Amino acid sequence: MILAFTEDGSVFVFTKQEDACREFEGIDVENGVVTFYDDAGTPLRPDFIEPNQQGRSFFIRWVVSGKYRLVRDPYTEQDPFWLALHESSHLEPNSEFEILDDLKRHVAAKGAVVDPPDSSD
């Protein structure tokens, strides 16, 4: 299962990686508009098979979105899963979960940290 978090606070749930990669353009992924995790809370980084292309022709800027796959990367610099979940406000309709709390329970059962670390230490 792939979880995609967008900068507007939405969470998308995909059962197949291909569906997640098809939903979000490579240029947006490269620019951090969306970040991905698996349902155990492990970050997924984009591995570009075909790079994004950008250029200018006179005064017109053009962009061709590249193709990518998602690779597990627990050492990436993206936000920890609990923070991405905490900043989310909307779960997009999907076949797995009705509300964000359902998603939170599912990933917690798989071992993901879903709450902020205790800062009282």
Predicted regions and their residues:
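Low-complexity intrinsically disordered segments
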Residues: 30-121
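Short, extreme N-terminal segment that most often corresponds to the first beta-strand
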Residues: 1-18
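Long, charge-rich C-terminal accessory regions
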Residues: 24-26
